[in-house]
Design a protein with these regions (language model features):
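A donor-sugar binding/catalytic signature common to diverse glycosyltransferases
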Residues: 141-144, 154
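Flexible, glycine/small-residue-enriched loop-and-beta-strand segment within the central core
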Residues: 34, 41-141
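A generic "structured core" feature
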Residues: 75, 148-150, 154
């Protein structure tokens, strides 16, 4: 997939000549709540990888103040998703409706929004992490340095450094 904006992008966006499926992720991120270390790459053979923020970072609303922090030298495969707190519904309340995302529009106290549901916090990815094809990383998860997330794994809990996990919900396969 060749980016429609390839001619206008910084030449440092694409790490390999004539490969428009892979980007250095920190060159395409605009949201200040998403921090990406040097040399971290994202590959997408389905969609334009420049659109990572739109297509892969989901339910990331500014009102929650949660962040996506990705370390250096990470490899993120096509379709990996990062699901944030706003994807959660308040199972302990009277309604399953997503009232908290409307706090601003309804002029409610925005200071209460994070107490309106179980806010899990930031997603933090260490250095040298490999995230496989269509893996899903849930809100609040911390993945240690050197970890490997298998294809289509759903990661709901922290992953220790240098650990390979896979499955739904992801479980340790072995250390590396």
């Amino acid at each position: 997939y060749k980016s429609s904006s390839a001619d206008t992008m910084n030449s440092k966006t694409y790490p390999r000549t004539n490969d428009f499926q892979t980007v250095y992720l920190n060159t395409v991120i605009k949201n200040p709540a998403i921090m990406v270390g040097d040399y971290t790459i994202y590959n997408d053979f389905v969609n334009d990888p420049v659109l990572f923020e739109k297509n892969n970072v989901l339910y990331h609303y500014p009102i929650n103040k949660d962040r996506l922090i990705i370390g250096k030298f990470c490899s993120i495969a096509c379709g990996a998703k990062f699901l944030f707190n706003s994807a959660n519904h308040t199972l302990g309340s009277l309604s399953n409706y997503t009232f908290p995302i409307f706090f601003e529009e309804w002029n409610l106290d925005k200071g209460d929004v994070t107490s309106a549901w179980d806010n899990k916090g930031d997603i933090v990815i260490g250095n040298d992490v490999w995230i496989g094809y269509e893996a899903v990383i849930m809100a609040g998860v911390h993945i240690g340095n050197g970890a490997v997330i298998a294809s289509r794994a759903v990661v709901t809990k922290d992953v220790p450094p240098y650990t390979i996990v896979g499955g739904t919900s992801a479980r340790e396969i072995r250390k590396r």
